């Protein structure tokens, strides 16, 4: 299924489940998220982290992921190289990768309350946010 670019702001990476996308859209009708496998016919699947981050920047997409080990490092490398990325939302270790309900509540709550209005260029946010 091909997705339209204008309606999306968030891109779920290949290590997140399609269930996160579905659960988010059940909570918030037309929530602006798409899974990478559906985005541009899956052409971004398998891109290395730096290329994916820069592609998200060019497309105006914020990447949603679990990869706390390498994505922040790659985002820093992109910025140090004088390039930009579209932003990154990472789930903290306390968020189980199979708890799609909790993930979707965190993401939709954050996005609706504040994230949608932010300038996401080169920004990284961890959910849940620290108190």
Indicate residue ranges for each PLM-predicted region.
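Acidic, PIN/NYN-like endoribonuclease modules and their adjacent C-terminal/linker elements
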Residues: 3-4, 9-14, 18-40, 50, ...
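Acidic, metal-binding active-site segment of PIN/NYN-like and related structure-specific nucleases
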Residues: 49, 56-78
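Active-site metal-coordination segments of metallo-dependent hydrolases
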Residues: 45-47
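A general structural signal for short secondary-structure boundary/capping elements
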Residues: 55-60, 108-112
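Short, conserved, surface-exposed binding loops centered on an aromatic residue
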Residues: 1-3, 54-55
């Amino acid at each position: 299924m091909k997705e339209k670019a204008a309606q999306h702001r968030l891109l779920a990476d290949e290590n997140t489940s399609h269930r996160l996308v579905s659960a988010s859209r059940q909570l918030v009708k037309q929530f602006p998220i798409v899974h990478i496998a559906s985005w541009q016919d899956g052409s971004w699947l398998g891109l290395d982290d730096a290329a994916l981050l820069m592609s998200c920047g060019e497309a105006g997409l914020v990447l949603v992921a679990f990869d706390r080990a390498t994505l922040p490092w790659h985002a820093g490398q992109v910025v140090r190289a004088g390039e930009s990325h579209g932003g990154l939302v990472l789930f903290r270790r306390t968020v189980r990768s199979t708890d799609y309900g909790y993930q979707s509540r965190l993401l939709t709550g954050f996005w609706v309350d504040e994230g949608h209005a932010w300038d996401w260029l080169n920004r990284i946010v961890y959910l849940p946010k620290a108190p």
